[in-house]
UniProtKB/Swiss-Prot annotation:
GO terms for molecular function: ATP binding; tRNA dimethylallyltransferase activity. It comes from Cutibacterium acnes (strain DSM 16379 / KPA171202) (Propionibacterium acnes). This is tRNA dimethylallyltransferase. ATP binds at G16, P17, T18, A19, S20, G21, K22, S23. Signal peptide: none annotated. The gene is miaA. Pfam families: IPPT. The keyword ATP-binding applies. The keyword Hydrolase does not apply. The lineage of its organism: Bacteria, Bacillati, Actinomycetota, Actinomycetes, Propionibacteriales. Its cofactor is Mg(2+). InterPro entries: Dimethylallyltransferase, IPT, P-loop_NTPase. It catalyses: adenosine(37) in tRNA + dimethylallyl diphosphate = N(6)-dimethylallyladenosine(37) in tRNA + diphosphate.
Length: 319
């Protein structure tokens, strides 16, 4: 893949925990840039927003927002299609190159720290095979993570030492890679940017504010008909979707629909799980000292972010 031929165009990356307001900020910033004659488009990097029909639970940009600013990688996959880190890396990088080739500023939004790094950093990702992963996933569901961890320890002791026995998802991935390549080596980016002129901006909030926003978002999800959305998706294969069925909120509502617990418990577990995920996001993002942090509640947030983009446009800086 060719690198950025438009050396004066930055690649913008907005990061931050769930419910911090990244998506709305991205739309507002792109609109401001357009007025200043600097066209910009949004590239989703969240592995769940790519699924069609998962609108309420993933806070997919509204149709009005998508008409206002061009969005890439939104609602492009059926819920039965597996997603993966390598797929998102490929799709997002292609979208960035498409923007740059047209003289458009790409604005990456969403996703976990791992997905962000896989896209903007030089990172080689081992291959994936849905059938191989499905086989190990079935074994995980039937026998639990410790049995698989024992298998991993037998086949690759070093890999087993690096993965906690209870982390079923990582164990499945490690066994998949071993089946495909013969060994597993955790890939950690060395900090070399794929596009040298990349600017990362993060939104920060207090834990109290994050927790409240998440509770409010989940309440809004339920008010907007989230349970009905999950029920409809279950009718078109959500339960069989290896990736989509694990999305926060969707997994909990599916378990409620299966009779595992009542609706109030599904709602409670969604809030708890989302808060836990947000804290994990922040922990990983804080490890990247290239991220410039902005107060998500600052009244001049939009002005400051736009100013930072304009500064990047007029300088030759490289992170």
């Amino acid at each position: 893949m060719r690198k950025n031929e438009y050396v004066n165009l930055p690649v913008i990356c907005l990061v931050g925990p769930t419910a911090s307001g990244k998506s709305g900020l991205a739309v507002r910033v792109c609109r401001r840039l357009y007025v200043d004659e600097h066209p910009a488009e949004i590239i989703n990097t969240d592995s769940m927003v790519v699924y069609r029909g998962m609108d309420i639970g993933t806070a997919t940009p509204t149709l009005r927002e998508q008409r206002t600013v061009v969005h890439h990688l939104v609602s492009i996959l059926d819920v039965t299609v597996p997603s993966s880190l390598v797929l998102m890396q490929t799709l997002a990088r292609d979208a960035v190159e498409d923007c740059l080739s047209r003289g458009v500023i790409p604005v990456l939004v969403g996703g976990s720290a791992l997905y962000t790094k896989a896209i903007i950093d030089e990172m080689s990702i081992p291959p994936t095979d849905p059938e191989v992963r499905a086989r190990w996933q079935e074994k995980l569901d039937a026998e639990g993570p410790r049995v698989l961890h024992d298998e991993l320890a037998r086949r690759d002791p070093k890999a087993a030492e690096s993965i906690l026995p209870g982390n079923g998802r990582r164990i499945v991935r490690a066994l998949e890679v071993i089946d495909l390549t013969g060994s597993f080596t955790a890939t950690i980016p060395d900090g070399t940017l794929h596009w040298p002129k990349t600017v990362q901006m993060g939104l920060e909030l207090s834990r109290k504010d994050i927790d409240q926003r998440i509770a409010d978002r989940v309440d809004q999800m339920w008010a907007y008909g989230f349970v009905d959305e999950v029920r409809s998706l279950a009718n078109v294969g959500l339960r069989e979707g290896l990736t989509a069925s694990r999305a926060l909120g969707y997994r909990q509502v599916l378990e409620y629909l299966n009779g595992d617990y009542d609706e109030d418990e599904a709602r409670r577990r969604t809030i708890i799980g989302t808060r836990r995920f947000a804290r994990k996001q922040l922990m990983w993002y804080r490890r990247d000292d290239r991220i410039e942090w902005f107060n998500a509640l600052a009244p001049d947030l939009d002005d400051r972010v736009v100013a930072r983009v304009l500064t990047a446009l007029t300088t030759d800086e490289e992170d």
